[in-house]
Structures are given as C-alpha cells and as structure tokens.
Amino acid sequence: MIIDITEIMDWIPHRYPFLLVDRVLKIDPNKSITGIKNVTVNEPQFTGHFPARPVMPGVLMVEAMAQLAAILVAKSLGSTKNKEVFLMTIENAKFRRIVQPGDTMHIHAVIDQQRANVWKFSSTVTVEGEIAAESKFTAMIKDKT
C-alpha cells in the first residue's frame, strides 16, 4: 500500500519544514513500515549544515525514522486523531554514511514491542543499499488534552 504525502499529512501532524517522510512504500500494520525521504538542497538545514558541503544532520535522520514509526502507530491503531505520539528514548543511534542532497533515504521501521501505550522500534535508513543510520527508540502514545 503506497501512501502519498497528502495522506501522510492526514496521519501525522508534522509540516514543512519538519515533515521528513515523502512517501510510504509498504506498511504491515502492527509490524513494519518502509518509506522514503528525498533529500534536496532547498531544505533549510543545509544553509548552515554545511554551506560548502551540505550534509543531512544525523538527528534529522532519527526524526525521519520516528515520523515513519508514528505513521505505523497511526495505521496500527486505525487513527491518532485524538492521540499524540511522543519520542521517549533513542538508543544506539549510529551514523555510518553521509547523506547529502540528491540522495533518497529509504527508511524502515519495525515494532519490537508494544505494551499499553509504550511502543519500541528498530529502524534503519539506507541510501543506495548502504546503511546510513540505525537506531532503536521508544515512543509513548498519549490522549490529547
């Protein structure tokens, strides 16, 4: 099931310039999700990171993983209209390859565990088949107040 950017914005609250998932390529609710982020030189982070050699910040790769996982949570629950997804922990984040404008980040997230409102994930970002980043993280799903 492919989910385009318009539908992604129905499932998570992020917007430009902080929406870091362009398309969902595959989703298996309650299990895993795969999506992409096309990295372009027009993104605001590249004005300072770094002007002479733009490099995608590692924290934004982790954020892209978390946003993709939030889409998986929303699809698994059927809706998150009355809920919010908050990142609780980031563990073992590793950055193995530079990501730069022109690259397509292929992001994959897997649910490792889900208990009540706490969800644990493993995620990777690959570019041209090489692992660029990997991380484990935990998110909490809370009712909106």
From Swiss-Prot:
The active site is at 49. Keywords: Cytoplasm, Lipid A biosynthesis, Lipid biosynthesis, Lipid metabolism, Lyase. Its EC number is 4.2.1.59. It is found in: Cytoplasm. It catalyses: a (3R)-hydroxyacyl-[ACP] = a (2E)-enoyl-[ACP] + H2O. GO terms for biological process: fatty acid biosynthetic process; lipid A biosynthetic process. Disulfide bonds: none annotated. CDD domains: FabZ (cd01288). InterPro entries: FabA_FabZ, FabZ, HotDog_dom_sf. It holds the Pfam family FabA. Gene3D superfamilies: Hotdog Thioesterase (3.10.129.10). GO terms for cellular component: cytoplasm; membrane. GO terms for molecular function: (3R)-hydroxyacyl-[acyl-carrier-protein] dehydratase activity. Belongs to the thioester dehydratase family. FabZ subfamily. Involved in unsaturated fatty acids biosynthesis. Catalyzes the dehydration of short chain beta-hydroxyacyl-ACPs and long chain saturated and unsaturated beta-hydroxyacyl-ACPs. This is 3-hydroxyacyl-[acyl-carrier-protein] dehydratase FabZ. It comes from Rickettsia rickettsii (strain Sheila Smith).
